[in-house]
Amino acid sequence: MKSLKIIPVFTIVIAMTLSAAAQKDKSKRPSPPVQVSKSVNGTTVTIDYSQPSKRGREIFGGLEKYGKVWRTGANETSWIQVSKDVKVEGKKLPAGKYGLFTIPEKEEWTIIFNKKWDGWGAYEYSKEDDVLRVTVPSNSTDEIVERFTIDIADSGEVSMAWDQTQVSFSLK
């Protein structure tokens, strides 16, 4: 009789263990993680982010409100790491790892490099932790980009595209 009572408890423990293991497999998320890395003039630049999908939604000005700090992807805070000091749009960014946040606007975006890189989304974002902010133009595209994508060109141009919006900043 005692063994019959143990079976449901054992089943629950196994189910919880399997569920926890599945959650650790980030590749199965609706917004899977991506990491891009490139050597730019002898500096290794790595960007880690998750790729949300458009899925028929209006993205900028809709899902992601204009004028609000955005995590620049999905899930955990997106981050960028540079192995040496670089210039971002002509402004110095010391070597290190930074949270990559943005403030989308219709005509221009603010790109933010923040001390807080290890968190969930932009919930723990604080302007006081900003290391550098640059403003760049926002461009409309004819083509719809379904998944948010960040690319690093050999020249050091970092490009972000989603829906019908594309934004770039230079890293030298």
Regions found by a protein language model. Give the residues of each.
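Primarily secretory-pathway and cell-envelope proteins
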Residues: Q23-K68, G119-K172
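Short, surface-exposed loop and linker segments with low hydrophobicity and enrichment for Pro/Ser/Thr
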Residues: K5, P94-G96, T102-E105, F148-D154
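Bacterial Sec-dependent N-terminal signal peptides
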Residues: M1-D25
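Mid-length scaffold segments of soluble, non-membrane domains
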Residues: R71-G119
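Residue-level signal for beta-strand positions within conserved beta-sheet cores that form or flank
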Residues: L18, E107, D130
